[in-house]
């Protein structure tokens, strides 16, 4: 009884302290906005029944601290039920409690036992284990109290919700603040997505006393005491305020949504306007650009064309697009493609549509360079240009060696001349330029060019061999060029020499010696023994004096390309003979269809010079591309003029090529089919100089007959490159290099692509090897040679095998796989091949005369007794190549 009295006293002292705290008036801060659904404050909790307000979270308008109150119960650390005053102990049914709680007038200690329940610090209900926290309905407890099998920590969880310091409801995340309905919390409690600060207030109010007892409670992280206060009058009208706030909120949301829609429409409208302006700007810029282009490249007032022109070329001349011309032609009813040609009449109509005119001209007139008006008073004597011609091995090059005191043959493979050479010597104070031409039949064009650029031809004829085919050819070249001939009969030092025989042979070609009453100069020489050389030079100077050779060194240079090659260190190097005028470094020129500007001039001695005059041979560096040997060389006023002339000549070349295109007609259809049946040996030809390329190409293309032919798919001067190997691999061709070798990379690529490269230094070897390859491509001749015959004495029909003829070899031999003719009554009734030959049951290769055997003929069963089987052996005879 005394213990109960002490407990009551302690409880009373606690109540007195709480009453003192209540006397301190505090300001309560309330939130301006209310939750439309829960009707609860976010910063304060209102206890409707007991008029208590706390910072903790309230359910059903209950005041709370760390403990949660249910059903209008005041809470501290302990939880109160049914208006019960609580401390550390909990009271039930309006019972006063201390550390121990009494139920149903039962005495309690530290542990309270209910209905034979074990107690400790925690109070157990209905056979439940307790700790500091009170468990209900077989629930595990900690500091927090769990309901309905919920795990608890400091926070109290409802309906299987995870808790922290804050209490979560309806799967809401909590921190120090308590969240409701997916609301974010801070130190204050948020309701219905309303923003929270530490305190949000719309109205200040004083809090009065309350009869209910409370303990100290603190709001998390704020460390403020919870004070009971009277509920202000504003709470009574919460429902109406909530309704108005909801309407106001909906109205604001509607206005905001409407503003967003209008803003989005405005953005789309502005974007469309911007895009439209951008498109218009682009179109305008394109029109301006086209206008500027037209101003920069206006349509010419007149254009020059030949008989026909392609649409692309016409568009280029008119500074228009090909598509524009094609569209215009379509409007005129003419359907063409970009590379299709139109005649001059159609071109005239089309050009007139654009306000221009057409001048139909001959392109030949445009390819000529207008020469200077020559002042005859400036013409002076020039050195003679002498071309040495004759048959191979008649001593032409040896003669030049004597004239220059050098051994030229050491520089030529095989001891024969395969390049045209130019040398200048001085004799009796006068210069003489010599051109050495090859004597081999393959170098006909070189000899022809030599005759065209020369002043005098020295025809070298062997006193032993006499007149040979190339001798006659040289005579014809000289006569065509209208060039005088001096005959040098060489090798007179040999015992078998017969100069008179040579004179007699040459007289048949209108070359009659002066001592025979003719006008042709004959000189007997021996280049080996240096006999008659001075006399020959004297005759050359005499002949040139009689011809009155003159030139004007002050005019622009005119000459001819003798040869061209590619030097690895210098590029394209061309040997040019200057016929008139003087060539300087820096001059612009045209050589054939090529143009260029002189970068360097190198003499025959290998010395760089600044200029070269008439009748001199010089090596020129500066060609834009490789010219052809024999092309005319001419200096122009400007580089622009040189480019224009070069372009015109290229057009002429294309025009002539287009005219030479062979069209298939009914008349030549058979020839085309026959030509397609020919076997071709495709060759890619590379040589050191352009003249050698030309000579070797002409010689190889002559190797043609009814079955095979050579086709040079590509030829040029220079080393064998990777491009040549790739071309050969694609076209299934072999590569022939004449005096050139492949680069290291080209050789590696050739090994990878299995491309055959053949290298030659002598033209004879190249032609001979190609002939051998062509012979291998020829189909061999097939001949049937009689080897024997056999008489059929029995016919045996073997099931699943066939008909076997039992034979007796009456003459010669019978071989397996031999060709047979089956003869009956003197007539051939079948021709076939022996598929099986046996002696008794053994397979044999052949059966000799007077032996019996079994013969089965392939795919033939109509054999009878008395038939004669003739056997033949097929032999293939290799053909020899004949042109």
From Swiss-Prot:
Binding sites annotated in the UniProt record for GTP: 390-397, 436-440, 490-493
GO CC terms: cytosol
Top-level lineage group: Bacteria
Secretion signal span: none
Region (G2): 415-419
Disordered: region residues: 32-216, 251-275
Record has Mitochondrion as a keyword: no
Domain tr-type G: 381-554
Cell compartment(s), UniProt: Cytoplasm
Region annotation G4: where it falls in the sequence: 490-493
Single annotated GO MF: GTP binding
Annotated segments matching region G3: 436-439
Keywords noted in UniProt: Cytoplasm, GTP-binding, Initiation factor, Nucleotide-binding, Protein biosynthesis
PROSITE patterns: G_TR_2
Stretches the record annotates as G1: 390-397
Pfam families in alphabetical order: EF-G_D2, GTP_EFTU, IF-2, IF2_N
Composition bias, Polar residues: 32-45, 75-216
Record field: compositional bias (Basic and acidic residues): 46-62, 251-260
Chain spans, region G5: 526-528
The family this protein is said to belong to: Belongs to the TRAFAC class translation factor GTPase superfamily. Classic translation factor GTPase family. IF-2 subfamily.
HAMAP family the record matches: IF_2_B
Function: One of the essential components for the initiation of protein synthesis. Protects formylmethionyl-tRNA from spontaneous hydrolysis and promotes its binding to the 30S ribosomal subunits. Also involved in the hydrolysis of GTP during the formation of the 70S ribosomal complex.
Protein name in the entry: Translation initiation factor IF-2
Organism (species): Borrelia garinii subsp. bavariensis (strain ATCC BAA-2496 / DSM 23469 / PBi)
């Amino acid at each position: 009884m005394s213990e109960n009295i002490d407990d009551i006293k302690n409880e009373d002292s606690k109540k007195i302290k709480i009453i003192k705290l209540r006397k301190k008036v505090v300001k309560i801060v309330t939130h301006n906005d209310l939750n439309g659904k829960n009707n609860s404050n976010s910063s304060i909790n209102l206890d409707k029944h007991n008029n208590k307000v706390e910072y903790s979270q309230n359910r059903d308008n209950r005041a709370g601290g760390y403990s949660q109150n249910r059903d209008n119960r005041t809470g501290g650390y302990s939880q109160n039920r049914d208006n019960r005053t609580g401390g550390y102990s909990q009271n039930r049914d309006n019972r006063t409690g201390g550390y121990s709680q009494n139920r149903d007038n039962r005495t309690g200690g530290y542990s309270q036992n209910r209905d034979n329940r074990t107690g400790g610090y925690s109070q157990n209900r209905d056979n439940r284990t307790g700790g500091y926290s009170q468990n209900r309905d077989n629930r595990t407890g900690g500091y927090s109290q769990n309901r309905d099998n919920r795990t608890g920590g400091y926070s109290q969880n409802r309906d299987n919700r995870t808790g922290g310091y804050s209490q979560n409801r309806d799967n809401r995340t909590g921190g120090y603040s308590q969240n409701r309905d997916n609301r974010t919390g801070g130190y204050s409690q948020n309701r219905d997505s309303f923003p929270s600060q530490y305190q949000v207030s719309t109205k200040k109010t004083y809090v009065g006393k309350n009869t209910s007892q409370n303990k100290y409670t603190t709001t998390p992280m704020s460390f403020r005491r919870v004070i009971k206060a009277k509920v202000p009058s504003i709470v009574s009208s919460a429902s109406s305020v909530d309704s108005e706030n909801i309407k106001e909120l909906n109205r604001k949301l509607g206005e905001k949504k409407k503003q967003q829609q209008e803003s989005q429409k405005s953005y789309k409208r502005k974007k469309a306007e911007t895009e439209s302006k951008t498109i218009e700007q682009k179109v305008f810029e394109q029109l301006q650009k086209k206008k500027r282009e037209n101003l920069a490249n206006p349509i010419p007032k007149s254009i020059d064309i030949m008989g026909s022109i392609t649409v692309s070329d016409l568009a280029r001349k008119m500074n228009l697009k090909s598509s524009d011309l094609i569209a215009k032609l379509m409007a005129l009813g003419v359907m063409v493609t970009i590379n299709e040609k139109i005649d001059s009449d159609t071109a005239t109509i089309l050009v007139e549509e654009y306000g221009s005119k057409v001048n139909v001209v001959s392109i030949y007139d445009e390819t000529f360079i207008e020469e200077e008006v020559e002042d005859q008073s400036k013409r002076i004597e020039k050195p003679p240009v002498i071309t040495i011609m004759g048959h191979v091995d008649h001593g032409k090059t040896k003669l030049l060696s004597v004239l220059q005191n050098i051994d030229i043959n050491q520089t030529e493979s095989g001891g024969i001349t395969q390049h045209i050479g130019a040398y200048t010597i001085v004799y009796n104070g006068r210069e003489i330029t010599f051109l050495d031409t090859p004597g081999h039949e393959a170098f006909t064009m070189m000899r022809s060019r030599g005759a065209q650029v020369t002043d005098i031809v020295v025809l070298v004829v062997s006193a032993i061999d006499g007149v040979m085919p190339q001798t006659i050819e040289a005579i014809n070249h000289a006569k065509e060029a209208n060039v005088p001939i001096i005959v040098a009969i060489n090798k007179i030092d040999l015992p078998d020499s017969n100069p008179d025989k040579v004179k007699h042979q040459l007289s048949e070609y209108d070359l009659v010696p002066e001592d025979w009453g003719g006008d042709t100069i004959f000189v007997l020489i021996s280049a080996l023994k240096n006999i008659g050389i001075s006399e020959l030079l004297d005759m050359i100077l005499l002949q040139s004096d009689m011809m009155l050779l003159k030139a004007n060194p002050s005019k622009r240079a005119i000459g001819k390309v003798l040869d061209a090659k590619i030097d690895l260190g210098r590029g394209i190097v061309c040997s040019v003979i200057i016929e008139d005028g003087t060539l300087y470094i820096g001059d612009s020129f045209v050589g054939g269809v090529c143009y260029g500007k002189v970068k360097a001039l190198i003499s025959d001695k290998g010395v760089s010079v600044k200029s070269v005059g008439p009748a001199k041979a010089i090596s020129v560096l500066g060609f834009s591309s490789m010219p052809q040997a024999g092309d005319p060389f001419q200096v122009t006023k400007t580089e622009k003029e040189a480019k224009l002339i070069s372009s015109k000549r290229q057009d002429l070349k294309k025009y002539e090529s287009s005219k030479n295109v062979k069209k298939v007609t009914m008349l030549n259809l058979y020839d085309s089919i026959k030509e397609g049946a020919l076997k071709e040996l495709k060759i890619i030809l590379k040589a050191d100089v352009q003249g050698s390329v030309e000579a070797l190409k002409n010689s190889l293309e002559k190797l043609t007959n009814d079955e095979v032919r050579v086709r040079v798919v590509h030829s040029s001067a220079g080393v064998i490159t990777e491009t040549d190997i790739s071309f050969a691999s694609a076209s299934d061709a072999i590569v022939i290099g004449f005096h050139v070798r492949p680069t290291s990379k080209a050789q590696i690529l050739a090994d990878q692509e299995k491309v055959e490269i053949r290298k030659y230094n002598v033209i004879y070897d190249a032609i001979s090897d190609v002939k051998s390859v062509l012979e291998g491509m020829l189909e061999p001749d097939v001949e049937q040679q009689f080897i024997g015959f056999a008489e059929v004495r029995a016919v045996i029909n073997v099931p699943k095998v066939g008909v076997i003829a039992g034979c007796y070899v009456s003459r010669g031999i019978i071989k397996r796989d031999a060709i047979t003719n089956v003869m009956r009554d003197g007539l051939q009734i079948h021709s076939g091949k022996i598929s099986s030959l046996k002696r008794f049951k053994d397979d044999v290769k052949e059966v000799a005369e007077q032996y019996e055997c079994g013969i089965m003929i392939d795919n033939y069963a109509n054999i009878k007794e008395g038939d004669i089987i003739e056997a033949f052996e097929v032999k293939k005879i290799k053909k020899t190549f004949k042109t």
